[in-house]
A protein has these predicted regions:
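Sec-dependent N-terminal signal peptides
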Residues: 4-15
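Beta-rich carbohydrate-recognition and catalytic domains
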Residues: 21-268, 273-336, 350, 356-516
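Extracellular glycan/ECM-engagement signal in secreted proteins
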Residues: 340-343
Length: 517
């Protein structure tokens, strides 16, 4: 999945339209928007929370029939519900099952300390669904108008020891679920579901087995989630039909297992979420070994999560091959193996992004047992920065000031200085918006900082014009910029799994606190 010339041309077209018309913070994950620069481009990774795991098996119903502990989202879902002002988690637990798992619910006021409420679905437990599943995706669908379908559960259920199918359920509260409303054909295991608001489609990321590439992904989309599930079925060896398309496989330069370097990487899972102006993709890269070898060695398979981004929801830029959510090299750690992503990532908590993951302890007797839930944290927008050292540098972006574009904001960590100059379409500084006119950002670390000039507190006078924004940095990192309709700096972009103080509509707009929207 490298950037080929045709794809690059397509992305250039998309991004030119995007920067001109898109609302949302503009992230430096996207190099196609850069006209000129002499800055260094730096990829960043989250830091695991020191209090991990934030959730693990401590209830008898979280053990399977063999007594093995399970308490983590297998996709599952971790979301912030702005209406109820709490973090919500749907995770997989043993449930006394033999083949698969059941779905449990937990909640939190801060995203770090989780409680398992006693509910009435299976009295005396926090179990909310008893279908014996391989994996499950739970969506808190903030774009759904029907309140009875606000929560959606895509359950990959075991039919028997060898086959699985997907069922779709709805809920108004995330606790009490409907009977299945749609049923797929036979599938491979480890599928995932999500919503793409740019395409206005629900998406299934379907596992397939493709020759030399082995574990790979197929793509299925539909605006109706019931049709989506009903159309899903297993397809072999890089084949497609009218609705299902072959999507992608692992790259040769994806990370490999240090003890098994001869094993070619594979895609174990993939899911995605809208964040600001793009789709953020999570690629769980399998590095081996196979389950039989794991059993014989009493170890976990090595899965690590890498990230990518997309402007069209189908073609992915995966330039960074550094694990974003890695395993720990500590044999006894909660994430010693098999780290996988969770539906709802990222959540926006103040100046940070929260990423929840499932991780596995090395354990006996089963290679896939004993899993728990961890948290990793990253600066908001902090995937990639443009960095200047002691020598001043710049990055120049061509854009159009939108009709509602009143205020320019940046997300930057400035130990020295940052200034912005606005140039016309011919590359000449616009009077009143020169570097000298700019009010410097000095020795300040802000994820939302308004930029102004001595005679221009905003960019309202430039609305509708095509301009170049030249950011001058010295001893500074810039992570994002955006042009907001509001003096309070909301971007109009998508907010992932949500967060405290945000609008409950899934979009970064000013919140009417009386309505919790």
């Amino acid at each position: 999945m490298k950037k080929y010339s045709l794809l690059t041309a397509l992305l250039l077209l998309i991004c030119n339209v995007s920067v001109c018309g898109q609302t949302g913070r503009i992230l430096f994950v996207d190099t196609t928007l850069i006209e000129k620069t002499n800055l260094q481009r730096i990829h960043h990774s989250p830091i695991y929370y020191s209090g991990n795991p934030v959730l693990k098996a401590d209830k008898k119903w979280e053990l399977n029939i063999n007594g093995d502990p399970h308490a983590a989202p297998f996709s599952g879902g971790v979301w912030y519900d702005e209406e109820e002002q709490k973090f919500k988690m749907w995770y997989s637990a043993g449930g006394g099952k033999l083949l698969g798992l059941v779905t449990c619910y937990a909640e939190s006021s801060d995203g770090k300390v989780w409680i398992k409420p006693v509910l009435d679905v299976v009295p005396g437990t926090n179990i909310v669904d008893t279908l014996e599943h391989d994996c499950v995706s739970v969506l808190l669908d903030k774009f759904e108008k029907d309140r009875t379908k606000r929560y959606k559960m895509f359950v990959v259920e075991f039919n028997n020891r060898f086959t699985v199918s997907m069922k779709l359920k709805y809920s108004s509260d995330g606790i009490h679920w409907s009977a299945p409303k749609a049923l797929s054909g036979e599938l491979y295991d480890r599928c995932a579901a999500y919503y793409d608001p740019f395409r206005k489609k629900y998406v299934l990321s379907l596992k397939t087995i493709n020759g030399v590439y082995r574990r790979s992904r197929n793509y299925l989309e539909h605006e109706d989630p019931e049709m989506l599930v009903s159309l899903a079925h297993r397809i072999y060896d890089n084949k497609s039909d009218k609705f299902i398309r072959y999507w992608f496989n692992a790259d040769e330069d994806d990370p490999r297992h240090p003890q098994f370097p001869g094993l070619r990487p594979q895609i174990y899972n993939h899911e995605a979420m809208p964040y600001e102006g793009c789709m953020l993709g999570y690629f769980t890269v399998w590095q081996g070994p196979e389950n039989s070898v794991c059993d014989s060695l009493n170890i976990q398979k090595r899965n690590e999560v890498l990230i990518g981004w997309s402007k069209d929801g189908f073609h992915w830029n995966r330039e960074s091959k550094k694990p974003f959510l890695p395993v720990s090299e500590d044999f006894h750690a909660w994430n010693a193996g098999n780290v996988q992503s969770t539906a709802g990532n990222p959540l926006i908590v103040g100046d940070s992004l929260y990423f929840y993951v499932s991780g596995r302890y090395n354990s006996k007797p089963k290679h896939d047992s004993n899993f728990a839930t961890g948290l990793a944290m990253l600066r908001r927008d902090g995937f990639v920065s443009m960095r200047a050292g002691k020598k001043e540098g710049y990055v120049e972006i061509k854009t159009q000031i939108p009709a509602n574009g009143n205020y320019l904001f940046v997300n930057a960590d400035v130990k020295g200085t940052l200034a912005v100059e606005v140039l016309n379409d011919n590359g000449q500084p616009i009077e009143g918006f020169t570097k000298r006119d700019c009010i410097l950002m000095k020795k300040s670390d802000k994820t939302k900082q308004m930029i102004s000039w001595k005679k221009h507190p905003d960019v309202t006078s430039l609305i509708g014009k095509t301009v170049r924004l030249r950011f001058y940095l010295k001893q500074a990192d810039i992570y994002a910029f955006w042009i907001s309709a509001w003096q309070t700096g909301e971007s109009g972009g998508y907010t992932g799994g949500g967060g405290p103080g945000l609008s409950g509509k899934g979009i970064d707009t000013p919140m009417d606190k009386s309505k919790n929207n």
